[in-house]
Swiss-Prot record:
UniProt pathway annotation: Cofactor biosynthesis; ubiquinone biosynthesis
Descriptive protein name: Ubiquinone biosynthesis protein COQ4 homolog, mitochondrial
Role: Lyase that catalyzes the C1-decarboxylation of 4-hydroxy-3-methoxy-5-(all-trans-polyprenyl)benzoic acid into 2-methoxy-6-(all-trans-polyprenyl)phenol during ubiquinone biosynthesis.
Names of required cofactors: Zn(2+)
Subunit structure as annotated in this protein's UniProt entry: Component of a multi-subunit COQ enzyme complex.
Originating organism: Arabidopsis thaliana
Cellular component, GO annotation: extrinsic component of mitochondrial inner membrane
Length: 226
């Protein structure tokens, strides 16, 4: 399997070294998705183990673990052909308007087992689906807000570190807007919605976007205050 072949076994000391190096590198250049991904993997094992156990207790979660769907062009390309009101079409519009490709995510390399590697891969690949569901942009405020939701859902240390790093890079207006409007919303939204790692999104692409939001308890992001 591709996920298994991509894995790099690390000792505890090596994990610590990769985590520290990734954290420092990500602070210097927050655009380095590979460093942020490595940080998430080397610090996130306990969190991914908890997510895995929750998925095993959920009907859709078990189906995901059994079938191992991937959010890649080959498997989700049909979303571009769905009616405008659907969740799948909204995802396609989100991706297309930004010239994003589902295939751009870096591979998981530092998880100990194939099963955990898949869970980490799934968490990484549904990121843009969550952007779509919550109506969040990909600017600094949008990404920081989604990291808060991801932390509430998965308790990944990397998510909280990313939020802290994001607030440091905010200008005064952005920081005020985030702390006053987006942070409280993101905490509430992340806690109120269903367990999003146990949702088999691909099975719901053809459903109405607003209906799936209601079904999963999604609170869309606040609009930018005037």
């Amino acid at each position: 399997m591709i996920i298994e072949r991509a894995r790099v076994p690390l000792s505890r000391w090596q994990q610590a070294a990769v985590a520290m190096g990734s954290a420092l590198g990500a602070l210097v250049d927050p655009r380095r998705a590979d460093l942020i991904a490595a940080l998430g993997e080397t610090t996130g094992k306990p969190a991914f183990e908890m997510v895995l156990e929750r998925m095993k207790k959920s009907e859709e979660g078990r189906a995901i673990l059994l079938e191992r769907p991937r959010v890649v062009s080959e498997q989700v390309g049909h979303a571009w052909d769905l009616p405008e009101n659907t969740f799948g079409a909204a995802y396609a519009k989100f991706m297309g308007s930004r010239n994003f490709s589902p295939d751009d995510r870096p591979p998981v390399r530092f998880m100990e087992t194939d099963e955990l590697a898949y869970v980490a891969t799934r968490a990484r690949e549904v990121h843009d689906l969550w952007h779509t569901l919550f109506g969040l942009p990909t600017n600094l405020i949008g990404e920081s807000s989604l990291k808060v939701i991801e932390f509430e859902q998965m308790y990944l240390p990397m998510c909280m570190l990313s939020v802290i790093g994001g607030t440091v890079r905010f200008n005064e207006k952005q920081r005020s807007m985030f702390l006053k409007h987006y942070l409280p919303w993101a905490v509430r939204a992340g806690r109120q919605c269903t367990d999003l790692m146990c949702v088999y999104y691909e099975r719901h692409f053809s459903e109405d976007l607003e209906q799936v939001r209601r079904k999963w308890g999604i609170i869309p992001a606040p609009q930018h205050p005037k």
